[in-house]
């Protein structure tokens, strides 16, 4: 989207805040259905970031693949779970939770120190309009298809095998009831 500077900045900050709150919802909600809906919100915000970056095809692929398929599959698997499997116990903190929070806090402080120590003056933040070559959407889609079937064939197939194994594992876990 071609927006003016302040509007674009406000949208980026707003989407970033919604993205952070949605991510916290994914982690902190005890009900897995609420967590799955928060994950859907996070994935929609990522798609809106792609729209702000003028990458409409990636935004559409994000919506179709992740929100439309993966998140619906997660909700479908959660619906097959019994209610007792995610009961609300009073045992809120375990040793694993403490270790996880310690590791995440350490990573957060490491990122903050890295960002504050980085010299940002040499980075070009925007692209100039004369450097962007306009191409048809069809040719871009064809180029993506050609790259996926030639240059990135092995990673593409490995990702599809990983997704297939995850799907089979989720189905087998749901059937063990």
Curated annotation (Swiss-Prot):
The molecular function terms of the Gene Ontology recorded here are: NADH dehydrogenase (ubiquinone) activity; quinone binding
How does this chain sit within the bilayer? Multi-pass membrane protein
EC class of the enzyme, as a word: translocase
- InterPro entries on file: NAD(P)H-Q_Oxidoreduct_6, NADH_UbQ/plastoQ_OxRdtase_su6, Nuo/plastoQ_OxRdtase_6_NuoJ
EC assignment: the record states: 7.1.1.-
User: What Pfam families does this protein's entry cite?
Assistant: Oxidored_q3 (PF00499)
- Identify its protein family: Belongs to the complex I subunit 6 family.
What protein am I looking at?
NAD(P)H-quinone oxidoreductase subunit 6, chloroplastic
**What species does this protein belong to?**
Lemna minor
Which gene is the coding source of this polypeptide chain? ndhG
